Structures are given as C-alpha cells and as structure tokens.
Amino acid sequence: MTEPQTNRTSGAKIIDGKAFAADVRGQVAGHVQRLKDEHGITPGLAVVLVGEDPASEVYVSHKHKATVEVGMTSFEHKLPADTSEDDLFALIDKLNADPAVHGILCQFPVPDHLDERRTVARISPAKDVDGLSVTNAGLLSSGGEALVSCTPLGCLMLLRAEFDSLSGKDAVVIGRSNLFGKPMAQLLLGDNCTVTIAHSRTKDLADVCRRADILVAAVGRAEMVRGDWIKPGATVIDVGISRVPHPDKPGKTKLIGDVHFAEAVDVAGAITPVPGGVGPMTIACLLANTVTACCRAHGLDEPRGLTA
C-alpha cells in the first residue's frame, strides 16, 4: 500500500482519503484481473435495496459504479417497500447459495417492518462484506479470519500508511458503536496499540484525548473535539459527519466532522478532513472485502494490504 497523499496546512499533514481510496480501488482492480486471468474467476457483489429511499438509491448507484469499474460483477436487487421478511430472506438465501456471488449487502435503512439485525444475520458470514454480523464481530475480537466493517478497515489502512508501525502507540477511540467504535478498537488492538474506548460517560474526556498518539473521533457531534484536546503531533482520524448551515452562504449547508478542524490543524501532526478523508475509503474497502471473500471462497491467497 502506498502512503496516503497529503497536503500541508499550517503544522498538520492533511491526509487525502480520496486519493488513497483511488489507490485501493486500483489495487482491487489488479487483483480482480489476476483472478480472471489465472483462475477464470470474477468476483461478484450483490446489493439488495428495499424501498425507494432517495439517499439509499444514490449509495447503491455509487456502489454499482465502483464495482463495475474494478471489473467485478454487480448484482442489484431492488425490492418494493412492502416486501415481506420471508421474501427478503428467500432472496438472501438464494444469494448465499449462488457461487457467482461472493459478497452480499443489504442497504440500510430498511422499511420499519423489517429488522436490520435479523437481516444481517441471514447473510452468510463468509459473504458479509459489510462486516456487520455477530459472527464476523466475534471472529475479529478473537483474532479469527473475519470480514471487517468497511469504515474501520479504511481507517486502519490510513493509519498503517501513516506510521512505520502502530505497535505501542496510545490510541483513543471516541465512540463505542457496534458499527464503528468497537471494531475500530479491536483493529488497533490487533496492531498492538494501547487502546482506550471513550464515550458519553467518560470522565475528563479532553484529558483522555490528550494522551493519544492516535485519536479517532466517531460520535456524530459536530466539532466536539477542540484543538486543546489534541496531543501535539498526534494523528487525528475524523469519522464524524454533520451537515450544518454554511457560515458564509445563507441558505446553504456544509459538511463538518466531529473535530474542530481549524483548531486541530495547528496542533495535530496529521489529520483527515471532512469531507474527503475517511468517507471515500468506505466503498473502496467494500470492494476490497469482496475480493477477500472471493479468494477465501476459492481457497486462494488473500490480497496483501487489503485486509486487517
């Protein structure tokens, strides 16, 4: 994996997640071509969308485009909003059994009458390329062969490229969600960091953050992390995303993260911006997970640098 492209602003290095994600997608495309040339195998990703949520339709379109661009087969299944659980599960069972499908994801949210946890549990853990199942969470926590949730995996890739080694680094993850905080902490622990998970009940949160060589913020509270919370020279990964009124353009909005960027950039050694930092890594890692799942399904060596 090449080092993430960076830009200099004040004292901090700005980690260009968009450029890094493009590099990951390029590596995935190379692995896909080798699977085709050497083994006659084309990785396949199936995406299931229930209903007509506009944002979900945009996300599914982006995933389809990215899948095709790296040479994989994209299977799209769009179901009406009143689809029953039985019918949804019948489709998932069919995809689980299809040897041409190596990765399956159901785009969330689903309509209220469907249960997201039951839906994730129905997907074969070997094809759970979103890394959301309790099976993959358990494998990750026990050091097993898991498919890892895409956003934490993307953050780990950025951090590995930033440091020669993560071993011995003090890392603080703000946020304890099953989707991000917990798997992020497990990944950092797996790379021999000393990890603290902070959350809404953490006492003296700012003091806890000031000890971190690596600070990962994922709580969804706009600009909560101030510049004086950050250890000088620390690497800051901002996973939060909030839409707020634009200060200079009445009636317009802008995206900001959990970290007060203008303050943090003068203190941190390196930082991911919002937007353009962590976000682009998510779909790139979804593609990487699909290649990994394909290789595992066929008993082939996994692509180096694209897994945890």
Curated annotation (Swiss-Prot):
It catalyses: (6R)-5,10-methylene-5,6,7,8-tetrahydrofolate + NADP(+) = (6R)-5,10-methenyltetrahydrofolate + NADPH; (6R)-5,10-methenyltetrahydrofolate + H2O = (6R)-10-formyltetrahydrofolate + H(+). Its EC number is 1.5.1.5, 3.5.4.9. Pathway: One-carbon metabolism; tetrahydrofolate interconversion. This is Bifunctional protein FolD. Gene3D superfamilies: Leucine Dehydrogenase, chain A, domain 1, NAD(P)-binding Rossmann-like Domain. NADP(+) binds at residues 175-177, 200, 241. GO terms for molecular function: methenyltetrahydrofolate cyclohydrolase activity; methylenetetrahydrofolate dehydrogenase (NADP+) activity. It comes from Jannaschia sp. (strain CCS1). One of its GO terms (biological process) is tetrahydrofolate interconversion. Coiled coil: none annotated. Belongs to the tetrahydrofolate dehydrogenase/cyclohydrolase family. Catalyzes the oxidation of 5,10-methylenetetrahydrofolate to 5,10-methenyltetrahydrofolate and then the hydrolysis of 5,10-methenyltetrahydrofolate to 10-formyltetrahydrofolate. Homodimer. Keywords: Amino-acid biosynthesis, Histidine biosynthesis, Hydrolase, Methionine biosynthesis, Multifunctional enzyme, NADP, One-carbon metabolism, Oxidoreductase, Purine biosynthesis. The gene is folD. NCBIfam families: PRK14186.1, PRK14188.1. One of its GO terms (cellular component) is cytosol.
